[in-house]
Regions:
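Phosphate-handling substructures
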Residues: 83-140
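Active-site-proximal alpha-helix that buttresses catalytic centers in soluble enzyme cores
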Residues: 3-87
Length: 140
């Protein structure tokens, strides 16, 4: 049996296409930022390769889709799985449970700007700040 016909359930995670903020390195969580034209093209290109009968994402075999309620994620869904793909609205759940983490006070700032802010507060003298080890002031 080919992998495409396997009975094992699959979970696929798709990130939204490029936004102006992701393009410029700005931290984005709760702010509504639309896809750029390039971001929309990224998703459309991925859809052409990944979505369709016999492809990795076969709309007839999709059991459920979970989507962040951010506009960029909704637009990505619409480009990846358009209404013509026959996925019923009942199979789509918009949920805050899969939103990007909260950047708090660092929302909209670049890593360089965040490091400067933290330096001004006298923080990170031992090692340079990273979002992974030090988190976000006022966020996660």
């Amino acid at each position: 049996m080919s992998d495409q016909n396997a009975l094992t359930p699959r979970v696929l995670i798709v990130r939204h296409g490029e936004t102006e903020w992701s393009k410029s390195g700005r931290s984005t969580s709760f702010t509504e930022v639309d896809l750029t034209a390039a971001g929309a093209a990224q998703v459309s290109s991925a859809a052409a390769v990944l979505v369709g009968s016999g492809k990795l994402i076969d709309p007839c075999k999709v059991a459920h889709v979970f989507v962040s309620p951010r506009k960029r994620a909704e637009t990505t869904l619409d480009l990846l799985l358009p209404p013509s793909s026959d996925i019923s609205k009942e199979k789509i759940t918009f949920t805050e449970d899969i939103t990007e983490w909260n950047y708090g006070d660092y929302e909209g700032k670049t890593s360089e700007e965040i490091r400067r802010l933290r330096e001004d507060k006298g923080w990170d003298k031992e090692q340079e700040w990273t979002v992974w080890s030090d988190g976000c002031e006022g966020g996660e």
